[in-house]
């Protein structure tokens, strides 16, 4: 695994709270077509020097670097919400109306 790597982070134009980590300078057209289609137009969020010990919001630098080394990208999806909680909130809102 790489000791450190400059990476670019993009957010999805189609899916909220979805981020793509790639090597800085990675060509969008070189990524899998299925990924590009689902992700939509990439919106640049930031560039950073990533090391294995770096802690990120939902993952670690080690996981991101390993994925980039293996498949040229790391896709961070939104955390799954417990549908019970979502349904409960919806019922509360409906009750208030």
Swiss-Prot record:
It comes from the Bacteria. Residues 5-89 form the YcgL domain. Pfam families: YcgL. This is YcgL domain-containing protein Maqu_1609.
